Regions:
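Carbohydrate-binding surfaces of carbohydrate-active enzymes
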Residues: 1-191
């Protein structure tokens, strides 16, 4: 139920330069990839939409719009993620319930002995656990954080996480993510 019917939920968007690609300017794709990597390295949560579909209505829900040929805007301050560079993050909203799912993927592993080799498959994967992952989150106005749950394939059941309140009105919280190998989800449930 974590993935079924999920919708993008980031407050930043990166526009894919499809207009330029259709015009034969494929160099913009490299700029797009470089900008996307930069956002991922800084743990900025963002959605991706093609620039030929970026109507005012489509962009209305975003606080920051990143374009390959534009000045980089300030990132949304709703989430501030601290994690190793090997960890990537994304955000989604489930179809049911008032929740957000913060997904973490850890790419840190012991590399295969042979360069440019994937090894013999999944049984050769040697992930190195992600540690010291945390984030600061601003609770949307008019909402209360009901629960914070941590999911990972290494555990049979989700665990409750306790947020640390950072301000006097309780709207800004810090959440420390437990150690995980490859994948984890933190579910924020509101009331």
């Amino acid at each position: 139920p974590i993935y079924k019917g999920n919708h993008p939920a980031a407050k930043s968007v990166l526009l894919f330069p499809r207009k330029a690609v259709h015009a034969g300017t494929v160099a913009n794709v490299q700029k797009f990839l470089k900008l996307g990597d930069s956002l991922l390295d800084r743990h900025i949560l963002f959605d991706v939409i093609p620039d030929d579909l970026n109507t005012a209505e489509a962009l209305a829900n975003y606080k920051a719009v990143y374009r390959v040929d534009g000045i980089a805007p300030a990132a949304s301050s709703r989430f501030k993620i601290t994690a190793p560079k090997t960890v990537r993050a994304s955000l989604s909203r489930p179809a049911k319930g008032d929740k957000l799912h913060l997904h973490f993927v850890n790419y840190n592993r012991t590399e295969p002995a042979k360069p440019k080799s994937a090894g013999g498959g999944i049984h050769d994967e040697k992930p190195i656990a992600a540690e010291r992952v945390q984030f600061v989150f601003t609770i949307p106005e008019g909402k209360f954080l009901k629960s914070v749950r941590f999911f990972t394939p290494e555990r049979d059941k989700p665990l409750e996480l306790l947020p640390r309140i950072l301000d006097t009105n309780g709207q800004r919280v810090e959440i420390s993510v437990l150690e995980f190998l490859v994948y984890a989800v933190v579910e924020l449930e509101f009331e």
